[in-house]
Amino acid sequence: MSDKNEGYKVIADNRQARYLYEILETYEAGIELTGTEVKSIRAGKVNLQDGYALLRNGEAWLINIHISPYNASGQYFNHEPRRTRKLLLHRQELRKLIGKVEQQGLTLIPLKMYLKRGWVKVSIALGKGKKLHDKREDLKRRQDQRDIQRAMKSY
């Protein structure tokens, strides 16, 4: 399977987010970055695992995303790997997100980071944390689907 899908190239994927959270809605957001961060992202040195987004003062912030320092530039001009980065969303999207996060107690999680027409984009999702029994149910359902597919394939 190719990394290129409909004009964008996926750089990092947070697969664990779909296991830990029930995804309700997804949004595409731009991200405010420095030059060395963009170079490092293009090299694929990003970790989204522990990241989450916060809404503060009417703005969205991406927290705890690790972007490794860029090796070609010295230590002096490099960025801090886990700094807080601003997400760029439309005002209407921000209002909608603020309402849902504050009233319904939902969480904003980054699902994937990709390049779209040369710009770095982050796919963020409104998610509701799963309990242990929900995770087990999902695993059981997935296993049952695989068994059904195997049985259908043999006939």
From Swiss-Prot:
PROSITE patterns: SSRP. GO terms for cellular component: cytosol. PANTHER family: SSRA-BINDING PROTEIN (PTHR30308:SF2), TMRNA-BINDING COMPONENT OF TRANS-TRANSLATION TAGGING COMPLEX (PTHR30308). Its main location: cytoplasm. Keywords: Cytoplasm, RNA-binding. GO terms for biological process: trans-translation. It is found in: Cytoplasm. The keyword RNA-binding applies. One of its GO terms (molecular function) is RNA binding. Required for rescue of stalled ribosomes mediated by trans-translation. Binds to transfer-messenger RNA (tmRNA), required for stable association of tmRNA with ribosomes. tmRNA and SmpB together mimic tRNA shape, replacing the anticodon stem-loop with SmpB. tmRNA is encoded by the ssrA gene; the 2 termini fold to resemble tRNA(Ala) and it encodes a 'tag peptide', a short internal open reading frame. During trans-translation Ala-aminoacylated tmRNA acts like a tRNA, entering the A-site of stalled ribosomes, displacing the stalled mRNA. NCBIfam families: PRK05422.1 (NF003843), smpB (TIGR00086). InterPro entries: SmpB, SsrA-bd_prot, SsrA-bd_prot_CS. Residues 136-155 are annotated as: Disordered. The gene is smpB. CDD domains: SmpB (cd09294). This is SsrA-binding protein. Belongs to the SmpB family.
